[in-house]
């Protein structure tokens, strides 16, 4: 097997691992916000797809219509998770774009 000059696959893999570890730490600190019901239910999700907070406006709390509240929470959380995944994909794309590893393909990053 002939390797091109200047290409050290182990060094490239180590660099990728280091960058990925740093990115995971950074994503834990970055957040997105999402809401449903015109802001009646709001959530904050970090870049690791962890829900950090849920806020529910008192006006939407109706003991006679719990299903509506549940639907709003689900909608807000799903929107927050989607936004978080998009943010994470963009950040990971920055890492992948800076590396030149022939044959390496990571779904969603290239």
Curated annotation (Swiss-Prot):
A cellular component term, taken from the record's GO annotations: bacterial nucleoid
Keyword DNA-binding in annotation: yes
Chief location of this protein within or outside the cell: cytoplasm
Family affiliation: Belongs to the YbaB/EbfC family.
Pfam families xref list: YbaB_DNA_bd (PF02575)
Keyword annotations of the record: Cytoplasm, DNA-binding
Coiled coil: none
InterPro entries documented for this protein: YbaB-like_sf, YbaB/EbfC
Protein localization: Cytoplasm, Nucleoid
Role this protein plays: Binds to DNA and alters its conformation. May be involved in regulation of gene expression, nucleoid organization and DNA protection.
Protein name as it appears in the record: Nucleoid-associated protein Sfum_2790
Disulfide bonds: none
Record GO terms (molecular function): DNA binding
Keyword field contains tRNA-binding: no
SUPFAM superfamilies cross-referenced by the UniProt entry: YbaB-like
